[in-house]
Curated annotation (Swiss-Prot):
Annotated binding of Fe cation 1, by residue: H79, E81, H147, D166
Function as written in the Swiss-Prot or TrEMBL entry: Anaerobic nitric oxide reductase; uses NADH to detoxify nitric oxide (NO), protecting several 4Fe-4S NO-sensitive enzymes. Has at least 2 reductase partners, only one of which (NorW, flavorubredoxin reductase) has been identified. NO probably binds to the di-iron center; electrons enter from the NorW at rubredoxin and are transferred sequentially to the FMN center and the di-iron center. Also able to function as an aerobic oxygen reductase.
Record's signal peptide: none
Species the sequence originates in: Pectobacterium atrosepticum (strain SCRI 1043 / ATCC BAA-672) (Erwinia carotovora subsp. atroseptica)
The protein's name: Anaerobic nitric oxide reductase flavorubredoxin
Residues that coordinate or bind Fe cation 3: C462, C465, C495, C498
Gene of this entry: norV
Family of the protein in this entry: In the N-terminal section; belongs to the zinc metallo-hydrolase group 3 family.
Cellular compartments annotated: Cytoplasm
Keywords per UniProt: Cytoplasm, Electron transport, Flavoprotein, FMN, Iron, Metal-binding, Oxidoreductase, Transport
Annotated Flavodoxin-like domain residues: 254-393
Binding site for FMN: 260-264, 342-369
Length: 509
């Protein structure tokens, strides 16, 4: 089956209505997905990407019904992951000498998956072109770490089509191919879910790469993604949304998620949410039990939120395992511009709340006072929870509220060994109670748009792969001698792990 895209471009991909798990079981594809491959027939015939490996035979058979495989002049692989290049082995078995155009890093990935180093690879870099006849060219644009080191985009001149790889896509399956033909609510929900769960850690790179592409001043008629729809109706809309989402995005909403053994922590969550609504009925509040709800939906809601409250019962003096797993996911996604607080019930030891609070601080959230309740909360304890929610609403308000006291915060700059908390025996989050814990007000973490400053130790951390530059060690492989401060490191310096430049490094605080 083929679908006409534009002029001499046809979609030759594969729909996958049944898939419900992606990247192992890390991403729930509730709307299915598609693996988009494109066939270009100008004076030269070009295939851009293939499909997931489980559809290899069907893909090649469908392609053979459309074109003589021996007439394919070039294969372009924008991304070597198996859902993009999975059918290469099946295809190359029939046309083994066909040139494959890809990035240098893609060769390592492709040979690692398919074990054919003898294939006819041609490496490309940003700005390289490939003439395909009829006055048209393909222009290649490297996009490392969006979201693999090998990633790139391909732009077709004259037709003004950007084959964007994973960027601007979504795991969304529909009989229709174009964005103006599908349910708009479903589409944009899946776009945001995709960005929040996959691309958020690379937000700085998203912004930089989009501005780089826009700087080429190329006309744009379509964005042809690797998953989901082709953007033909106002294709720039998804680009502008990406710029918005990548810029420390938040809405006026608060997300609570928890796990509980005896419903006590659930009761706390409900009461806290009631308190938030008492003070600020305009704020959107969502509550999720991590053991019962879709993990990716929760992460998407956290991405959208200005703040998150994380609750856990104490089990063996630690947090519930599903809460711990969710916090690990959140740490990896590196959300920006968000506040957080921990809460939970306990019996003889409340270690879970302390650990949750510390993990939130480690993840870069601006944390406020935590809340513990012993055993099942009674009427007075639930009122403490409601008051806690009221104070959260005041402190996290994005607009003026009546009777809003000034609040102090705990910064993620220097996480404490034991997180401060209030209990049902204490005054809930009063100014005097918080002062008594010895916390001082400090500035919030720098946003990505602020100038980089050097940490007191001089150590800098790559925001993409987490590699750390230590001035005491330098980087001898790049002739950076021990004792070289970051400000004196040459601008040509590249992260040894991911190969990106100095602009993705942040000070370790």
């Amino acid at each position: 089956m083929t679908i006409h895209v534009k002029n001499n471009i046809h979609w030759v991909g594969q729909r996958d209505w049944e898939v419900r798990d992606f990247h192992g079981t890390e991403y729930k594809t509730l709307q299915g997905s598609s693996y988009n491959s494109y066939l270009i027939r100008e004076e030269k015939t070009v295939l851009i990407d293939t499909v997931d490996h489980k559809f290899s035979r069907e893909f090649v058979q469908n392609l053979m019904a459309e074109v003589d495989l021996n007439t394919i002049d070039y294969i372009v692989i924008n991304h070597a992951e198996e859902d993009h290049a999975g059918a290469l082995s099946e295809l190359m078995a029939r046309i083994p000498n066909t040139p494959i155009y890809c990035t240098y890093n893609a060769i390592d990935s492709i040979t690692g998956h398919h074990h054919h180093p003898e294939w006819n690879f041609h490496t490309v870099k940003t700005g390289d072109t490939l003439d395909i006849g009829n006055g048209k060219q393909l222009i290649f644009i490297e996009t490392p770490m969006l979201h693999w080191p090998d990633s790139m985009m391909t732009y077709m001149t004259e037709d003004a089509v950007l084959f964007s790889n994973d960027a601007f896509g979504q795991h969304y399956c529909d009989e229709h191919l174009f964005n103006d033909e599908v349910d708009q609510t479903e589409l944009f929900e899946q776009c945001q879910r995709y960005f929040a769960n996959i691309l958020t850690p690379f937000s700085r790179l998203v912004t930089a790469k989009i501005h780089e592409v826009l700087g080429f001043n190329l006309p744009l008629s379509m964005v042809a993604t690797s998953h989901g729809v082709v953007w033909r109706d106002d294709p720039a809309q998804i680009i502008h949304l990406y710029l918005k989402w990548a810029d420390s995005y938040q809405e006026d909403r608060i997300t609570l998620f928890y796990d509980t053994m005896s419903n006590n922590t659930r009761m706390m969550a409900d009461a806290i949410a009631q308190g938030i609504n008492d003070v600020d009925p305009g704020v959107a509040v969502k509550i999720y039990n991590v053991a019962r709800h879709d993990k990716n939906e929760i992460l998407t809601q956290v991405f959208r939120s200005k703040g998150v409250l994380v609750g856990s019962s104490t089990m063996n003096n630690v947090m519930m395992p599903k809460v711990a797993a969710m916090l690990e996911e959140i740490t990896g996604l590196r959300f920006q511009n968000k506040k957080a607080s921990a809460f939970g019930s306990y019996g003889w030891n409340g270690g879970a709340v302390d650990r949750v609070q510390t993990r939130l601080m480690d993840a870069g959230f601006e944390t406020t006072l935590a809340l513990k309740t012993k055993w099942r909360p009674d009427g007075s304890a639930l009122e403490v929870c409601r008051e806690h929610g009221r104070e959260i609403a005041r402190q996290w308000a994005l607009h003026p509220l009546d009777n809003t006291p000034a609040r102090r915060v705990i910064s993620p700059v220097k996480p404490a060994a034991t997180a401060p908390q209030v209990t049902t025996a204490a005054q809930p989050m009063s100014a005097s109670a918080e002062s008594a814990c010895g916390c001082n007000e400090v500035a919030a973490p720098q946003s990505a748009t602020q100038p980089t400053v050097q940490s007191e130790s001089g150590c800098m951390q790559c925001s993409v792969c987490q590699w750390i530059y230590d001035p005491a060690l330098g980087e001898p492989m790049q002739d950076v001698t021990p004792g070289t401060m970051w400000s004196d490191v040459p601008d040509s310096f590249l992260c040894p792990e991911c190969g990106l430049g100095k602009d993705v490094f942040n000070p370790i605080r």
